[in-house]
């Protein structure tokens, strides 16, 4: 399913008719990124407006959200996760509902349903915020039925869209060797300004060491936030206790998300402080969200929001001046990373991002097939194989997916290998092998019915053993 390819499945499904209409590939990633920036700014301003008076101060403070290093780090390299506005919107609907004394937020319902169609990693975040709202309402008003039915409706809507997009087919049991704990959040994440490929989001703070997959838990909030946050805590020192009591469920959910983000593999700078033993069953369960560091994002934005709540202690011109100063320091600090990401994007636009290695006479002839199948392993060059299949309208069992059904894949390969052992080839199928031994074992019964041999990429970095029915003698 496209749902496992980080291709923003809901948008892909809605725009497929457009691709058919224009007679080819319709590139929607840029449009989606534009929408992400617009909605990040919109919901950021709405959220800031709940705590800051007037228009000027919330708009100035909104720069914290629209220049969020996490936003820029994601939209330019992992577009589906650029929908950071889901977290801001969930927080806005939470606080708006709390102020109205409501629990049945239409906005949260929409977010919980739509999140599964954008990226499943947003689900635990939006649902955690929803659960906090429901728990606080239920215990304060001693009503369980209404919040329970509302939560059930949310689950139902999420499951329905997930089913429609193919997320509920199979088990999606495999996604590589890395399990829960590998992509954990380093304890230095809040003051480590280095992103992927060494992109530095600070003019002041140096890059800190990381281990394992800490890079995926990038959570630098910016120097403006880091300076303003302790000031806000001091200004709010008498109100913090009351805030935590009023929003106790949100605080508990944030604590759970933070612990999950840090994981059982506790890292600090370049060291692993401890690896807490967990049952294999829990590791397998938690590996559904193996990139655990991402689940810190609600806390990340709440820390930004806390600086604005502290800022609200200022009055009149001091408030606007404080908001403007905070925004200026923030943008000044994080702008190098923004410039680097922009430059990398411009450079990528000047060259073919994924130059094909499949330009030989063999690959020209192979365009006649309707299916290309990987027979023994997920291929090292899975991306180019997936693009080759897509460009030529082929099906493939090696689609460069984030997750795949390991059991179904093994069953399909067993069926295909049994057919080859019986001397039967599918004339519309190109068979690929990564291992020479597996290829030699499978090829003997069908060597007279297909071209069989080794094909190397144009640059010599990749090679495949192939069984190509109908190409013998060519």
Can you say where each PLM-predicted feature lies in the sequence?
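Periplasmic/ER-lumenal interhelical loops and adjacent helix-loop junctions
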Residues: 161-234
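Signature aromatic-anchored transmembrane alpha helix within multi-pass, membrane-resident enzymes
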Residues: 152-156, 254-255, 305, 311-339
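Extracytoplasmic
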Residues: 334-474
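Perimembrane helix-loop-helix junctions
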Residues: 124-156, 232-242
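Membrane-interface helix-loop junctions at the exits of transmembrane helices
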Residues: 59-77, 161-171, 189-202, 251-288, ...
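Membrane-embedded helix bundles of polyisoprenyl
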Residues: 34, 38-50, 56-98, 104-137, ...
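Membrane-interface coil-to-helix junctions
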Residues: 1-40, 68-69, 78, 193-197
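Hydrophobic alpha-helical membrane-interfacial segments at the cytosolic entry of transmembrane helices
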Residues: 142-167, 177-182, 186, 249-256
